[in-house]
């Protein structure tokens, strides 16, 4: 039986590829997709969700737009990474259907209410929508199996010295998620920087030769350009968000540990830092399954296999 999931995302090149992977996987039943502000402004990320689902011929999946800004600060976007549209590079179709006439929180709450079984939330952007859901619908917490997020890091940041982008955009929301009591699975930079896509992998995807694999290759062409900056020391481009979906499909290719994680919401130098109690110093019970490593070759193979689904 397929695992029911909802995806809250801010497309974004890697969010788009996470959607491609999820919708090529019969092991998963995507019940809804909601858009968060983050990589681009909320109207652009919502449009990008609709464009991707149009490309993938999935107008049956309900879509809704979310919060326009983080809980307690102005919105920060990553247009230097993802371009003016949020999905610069390929030529994507215009949306062929409209979003639901409700908010992301209302859509997620409706799906949880109607589901006969618990639902996994996958959040690949800032955690604003998820935090608002948790705050406004405590009666639905028991219907959430787990929250799988892309965000944070045990070590270095990628937007501030100590903070990863998604957590930095809305640290208060992320802290609410980690301390919610709902199991969290964290794909942070520790693992996503090991999930690099190399130029040869992009050509492999391109050679699959269907319209979706071609667009994924073109998305990665654009995404690769930003990551060529010498400061990163990368051979390729880290494919952050698809790690969440890949973990649901093949957890055995990931190395994980169980630890307590909190988010620094106020630090002068560390706002947005995910504080990982690696040595169990706080006495707090672990609240997070933390991904630390991935079999990169198996990860790329999984992507290639699922891209062939769109033939």
Swiss-Prot record:
Q: Name one GO molecular function term.
A: purine nucleosidase activity
**GO BP term, pick one:** nucleobase-containing small molecule interconversion
EC numbers on record? 3.2.-.-
Which top class of enzyme applies to this chain? hydrolase
Keywords, A to Z?
Answer: Glycosidase, Hydrolase
Catalytic positions? Answer: 240
Q: Which SUPFAM superfamilies match?
A: Nucleoside hydrolase
Presence of the UniProt keyword Flavoprotein in the record = no
Q: Which GO terms describe its cellular component?
A: cytosol
Q: Which domain of life is it from?
A: Bacteria
Is Hydrolase set as a keyword in this record? yes
InterPro entries given in the database record: I/U_nuclsd_hydro_CS, Inosine/uridine_hydrolase_dom, IUNH, Pyrim_hydro_RihA, Ribo_hydro-like
Could you say which protein family the record assigns here? Answer: Belongs to the IUNH family. RihA subfamily.
What the entry lists under PANTHER family is as follows:
INOSINE-URIDINE PREFERRING NUCLEOSIDE HYDROLASE, URIDINE NUCLEOSIDASE
Biological role: Hydrolyzes cytidine or uridine to ribose and cytosine or uracil, respectively.
- The protein depicted here goes by the name Pyrimidine-specific ribonucleoside hydrolase RihA
Q: Which organism is it from?
A: Klebsiella pneumoniae subsp. pneumoniae (strain ATCC 700721 / MGH 78578)
| Underlying gene | rihA
């Amino acid at each position: 039986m397929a695992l029911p999931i909802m995806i809250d995302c801010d497309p974004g090149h890697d969010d788009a590829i996470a959607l491609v992977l999820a919708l090529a996987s019969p092991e998963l039943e995507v019940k809804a997709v909601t858009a968060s502000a983050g990589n681009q402004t909320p109207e652009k990320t919502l449009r990008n969700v609709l464009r991707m689902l149009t490309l993938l011929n999935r107008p049956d999946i309900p879509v809704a737009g979310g919060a326009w800004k983080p809980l307690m600060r102005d919105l920060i976007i990553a247009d230097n990474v993802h371009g003016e549209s949020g999905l610069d590079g390929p030529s994507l179709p215009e949306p062929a259907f409209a979003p639901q006439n409700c908010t992301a929180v209302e859509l997620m709450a409706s799906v949880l209410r109607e589901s006969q079984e618990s639902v996994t939330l996958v959040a690949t952007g800032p955690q604003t929508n998820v935090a608002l859901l948790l705050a406004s619908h405590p009666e639905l917490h028991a219907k959430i199996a787990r929250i799988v997020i892309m965000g944070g890091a045990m070590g270095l940041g990628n937007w501030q010295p100590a903070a990863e982008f998604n957590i930095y955009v809305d640290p208060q929301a992320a802290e609410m998620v980690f301390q919610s009591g709902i199991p969290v699975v964290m794909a942070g930079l520790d693992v996503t920087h090991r999930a690099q896509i190399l130029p040869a992998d992009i050509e492999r995807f391109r050679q699959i030769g269907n319209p979706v694999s071609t667009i994924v290759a073109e998305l990665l062409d654009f995404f690769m350009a930003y990551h060529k900056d010498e400061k990163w020391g990368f051979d390729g481009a880290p494919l952050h968000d698809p790690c969440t979906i890949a973990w649901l499909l093949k957890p055995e290719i990931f190395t994980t540990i169980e630890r307590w994680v909190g988010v620094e919401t106020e630090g002068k130098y560390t706002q947005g830092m995910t504080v990982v109690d690696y040595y169990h110093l706080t006495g707090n019970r672990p609240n997070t399954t933390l991904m630390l490593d991935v079999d990169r070759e198996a990860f790329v193979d999984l992507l290639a296999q699922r891209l062939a689904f769109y033939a």
